[in-house]
Amino acid sequence: CKFLHGNNIVNFTRTDTRLAFEKLSDTLHISLNNATVSRMDVAYNFDVTYPPESYFYHLGNLPYYKRLEQMFYKGVEGLYYSSVSDKKQLVFYDKIKETTNRKDYVPPEYQNKNLLRYELRLKNHIKQIFKVNKVTVPMLYDVRFYNRIVDYWKSEYRKIVKQNEYEIDITD
C-alpha cells in the first residue's frame, strides 16, 4: 500500500494489488507473473466510533490460537491471536497510533480518526489453505481467487468468540 499510495492507511483494493505488482515488476525490470507467494497479509482499516482498543475486550478466545494482548504503559495497544503452529496470526490494533508511532505519514482525512486494523497474516502453507498447487502473483488479483482470500479473512474473524454481544461489522 505504501509502495503505491505513499501511506499504509488507505485500504488496498484488488485493482491496487495488480497495480502494485505491475509497478514492482517495472521497478525491478522482471516479470512477477510466475512468482510464488509464500506469505500473505490481508488487512482492512475500519473507521470506528470509539478508540480501537475499546473493541479488544469484546474479542474473546479463538480455538487453537493463543490470545495475546500487546501492552504498553498506556494500556492495551494491540491484540494478537497466534496459531499454535505459528503459521497464522490475526492482529487487531489502532492503525493511526501505529502509523504515528512509526513517524509515518497520516493523510489529513485520516487524522483524528479511530481506525481499527484487522490483519490476517498467513506465514506459509498458503497453497494448503486455499487448496491449490501453487499461489502465484496474478492469482492475488484474479477476481475469484481474491474473493476466496477475502472470504477466508472474514471466516477467521468469525471464529473468534465474541463477548458482550458486540461484533465488528466486516461485511464491506
Regions found by a protein language model. Give the residues of each.
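Structured, helix-rich domain cores that form ligand/interaction pockets
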Residues: 1-171
